[in-house]
Amino acid sequence: PVEVRYRPLVDLSPDGKTVVAERDQVAGVVDAVEELWTEIPPGSDATDILCFFSGEREIRDAADALTALKLPGTEVLPLYARLSAAEQHRVFRRSGQRRIILATNVAETSLTVPGIGFVVDTGTARISRYSQRTKVQRLPIEPISKASAAQRTGRCGRVAEGICIRLYSTEDFEARPDFTE
């Protein structure tokens, strides 16, 4: 069982119609990691945090911000397709430290990272699109579908209770397509 928490990056006015404040994605991820840091599922060694991002630049920015927190006994590890095989394999080797893994949607379905108890979902991904007009393949950043959000949530809670923080609102989630086109 996984508890899903919504922590949108925009704060609305009390009437829900006006954006009062907006945080950037890295700040939202840092806040979510700090929130999850104090929580450990009862009787579990699944204490690692898996954060989903749309690309390498976002991962590097978040890695810098999370490393600056200097959380004790923690290592921050990137995971994306262009990493060398040796760097990717670091994610699958448990160390004595708690890990924060920053990944693209490569970690959504194709592999299982051991020790994940928590997920932070930014709600975006690079989605492959082919333009019939220009005959060019593109990778724009788009909101993920409900099915992709469910896949991301399912990365935790496999061996014990888990928590997924989504950096978007319930209303945003409900408005998303069921599946990626």
Stretch-by-stretch model annotation:
Residues P1-E181:
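P-loop NTPase motor module signature
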